[in-house]
Regions:
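Leucine-rich, hydrophobic repeat-scaffold detector
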Residues: 1-16, 23-40, 46, 79, ...
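Residue position in alpha-helical solenoids
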Residues: 2-6, 47-54, 95-103, 122, ...
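Alpha-helical rod/repeat scaffolding segments in eukaryotic adaptors/tethers
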Residues: 10, 30, 58, 78, ...
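Residue register of alpha-helical TPR repeats
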Residues: 12, 16-19, 60-67, 107, ...
Length: 141
């Protein structure tokens, strides 16, 4: 792919590419094309990991990594893969919790609360899905 062969001295091109992939993933998610959204989010996360390895103190990159785990976790949740969603949400929570303690911008208590909420809501989602499945089983012998 030509995109990866272009010189990118300060990582700005890769940052913009990851941002674009994230926006595309969001659009695909809104169109209910979850597999395509997942592919975009995963590619954006990989680029962010590479950039973060080169700049481990970059708060914006840390935020992007946090957001990537949240987005991929949300896709897993929408696909009823609750165990996978839980693992991804726990990873995002750990990134957020660590960076709130360190005072890394843009992490704050609101982001932490949101992350905790997503993780805490999963058992309710799982229960509702199980109840729907059981109701369908009773209707269709």
């Amino acid at each position: 792919m030509i995109i990866h062969k272009t010189a990118d001295v300060n990582g700005m091109f890769k940052r913009e590419y990851a941002f674009t992939l994230t926006k595309l993933g969001t659009a695909k998610e809104q169109m209910e094309k979850l597999d395509e959204a997942l592919q975009c989010y995963t590619m954006a996360m990989q680029i962010t990991k590479e950039l973060l390895a080169a700049s481990p103190d970059d708060g914006k990159l840390k935020w992007n990594m946090f957001a990537s785990y949240e987005q991929i976790g949300h896709i897993a949740e929408l696909k009823h893969n609750y165990r996978e969603a839980e693992l991804l949400y726990r990873q995002s929570l750990e990134i957020c919790r660590t960076n709130v303690k360190l005072g890394t911008r843009p992490f704050d208590e609101d982001a932490l609360a949101s992350s905790l909420y997503r993780l805490g809501a999963l058992p309710l989602q799982r229960k509702a899905t199980d109840e729907r499945k059981n109701a369908l089983k009773k209707r269709c012998p």
